[in-house]
């Protein structure tokens, strides 16, 4: 049965939701480390997710921070058994969107407060930084925070978001080849291209087979709290708002690059059809939903 898998940081759960929204069940409980990104290995019947880790202590006037290095990646089987840690807690700082190239047996993810784009083998080995946007106290500048990621496996290119401060209109979407140029490092690549800047607060990405990049934005309206798309190949196009009115849009998933499922921190999953222009709420699971994926369980 095809279901949507969605992470809930408030309830510390992974929900499995029927495609028609008629049912929702708990697939994994006790997700105490603030889960965020999720990807499904259909062939091997595994589910991977990132954890942001424990949030920093203290009082917050806005959203909590995660400057402590305690991020991790976990994996579980489709039946909810054999849960184990793939990338140990503290290997990186804050796990955000997660994707994969299963043909190359690689996981890719963003480390927000760690200011980097990372990848590793499916078993957690061979961790390497592909992009590093800052170091030390530069993490206090949210313009350096990497969040969403997509991989073009054919062209060997990574796309990622740097969201900027909340509602500040300083977000960016960038891309670079997977392979770091000879003689360069992840922190001085010299081949990074900024596709769009001055975005409200871009979050998760999906690269469609037709050459369009689709992304969520949790920033201020009217351009924020939206789903957007723009062509990135063979040439760069203009960004277009496809759907509005979210309560901080986060996750995005699709099976056909036409119908998209979108989660938000308000607890809603909406389904939008880009060809027909339809847009409706599928289900509301209560705050706070993050990453979203599709699985044949």
Model-based region annotation:
Residues 2, 31-45, 89-105, 135-156, ...:
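Beta-rich, blade/repeat-based domains predominating
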Residues 23-29, 82-89, 126-140, 190-196, ...:
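A short beta-strand motif characteristic of beta-propeller blades
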Residues 50-68, 158-172, 217-221:
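Short, conserved, GDST-rich strand-edge loop motifs in beta-rich repeat architectures
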């Amino acid at each position: 049965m095809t279901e949507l898998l969605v992470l809930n940081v408030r309830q510390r759960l992974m929900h499995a939701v029927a495609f028609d929204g008629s049912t929702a069940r708990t697939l994994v409980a006790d997700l105490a480390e603030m889960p965020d990104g999720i990807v499904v290995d259909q062939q091997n019947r595994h589910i991977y997710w990132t954890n942001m880790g424990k949030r920093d202590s203290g009082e917050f006037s806005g959203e909590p921070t995660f400057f402590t290095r305690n991020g991790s990646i976990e994996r579980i089987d489709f039946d909810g058994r054999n849960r184990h840690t793939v990338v140990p807690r503290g290997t990186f700082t804050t796990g955000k969107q997660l994707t994969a190239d299963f043909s190359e047996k690689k996981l890719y993810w963003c480390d927000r407060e760690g200011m980097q784009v990372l990848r590793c083998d499916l078993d957690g080995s061979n961790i390497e930084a592909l992009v590093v946007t800052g170091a030390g106290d530069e993490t206090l500048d949210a313009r350096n925070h990497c969040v969403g990621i997509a991989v073009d496996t054919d062209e060997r290119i990574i796309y990622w978001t740097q969201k900027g401060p909340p509602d500040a209109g300083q977000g960016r979407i960038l891309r670079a080849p997977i392979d770091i140029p000879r003689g360069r490092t992840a922190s001085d690549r010299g081949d990074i291209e900024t596709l769009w800047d001055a975005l409200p607060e871009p979050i998760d990405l999906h690269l469609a087979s037709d050459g369009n990049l689709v992304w969520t934005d949790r920033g201020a309206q009217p351009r924020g709290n939206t789903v957007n798309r723009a062509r990135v190949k063979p040439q760069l196009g203009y960004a277009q708002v496809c759907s509005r009115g979210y309560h901080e849009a986060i996750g995005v998933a699709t099976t056909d690059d036409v119908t998209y499922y979108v989660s938000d921190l308000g607890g809603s999953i909406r389904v939008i059809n880009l060809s027909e222009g339809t847009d409706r709420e599928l289900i509301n699971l209560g705050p706070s939903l993050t990453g979203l994926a599709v699985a044949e369980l």
